[in-house]
Amino acid sequence: DRALGRRGVLVAELTYREAVSRAIAQEMERDPSVYFIGEDVAAAGGVFKTTEGLLERFGPSRVRDTPISEQAIIGAVMGAAMNGLRPVAELMFSDFFAGCWDLIANQIAKTRYMTNGQVSCPLVIKSGNGGSVRFGAQHSQSVENWAMSVPGIKVVSPATIDDARGMLQHALADPDPVLMFEHALLYNVE
């Protein structure tokens, strides 16, 4: 179960899903201010299983299930980020950004500018993105273009396993908000 990586070094074969999961766990291990919230991310391990095992490893204070309210999830991580934590929020599907877009585009993205750099929102919002996974019309869009023109937001959409791990780690180190769109058809790719 090992193969040569791009740099000729033996590496464990991972799926895209496992790379995302490991990156989250590594950053939570490295930085105690990183925590994870979203619908079904704790006990169920997330709709795409990218948070499987995190609850057992880090406990309920750092891996939390939320009600089905994207506005509540995003409002909570905004407040936490403004107060020194490094939250990661998962919105199950990127279509659901519509329900909390005001908070993302008009509040989170502009906090650094509205406070003259005194306050920032260092957070990550990650989401399954794209169609063809048979979850229905309201679970199939690719909405990263919504965020591309919003000043103050960084947008990443990892295409490879290395991208998924590296971009998530860099996003968690970034002083500004990062939206991470993970194409749903990539989760099982090795």
Please give the residue ranges for each predicted region.
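Thiamine diphosphate
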Residues: 5-181
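Aromatic-enriched
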Residues: 183-190
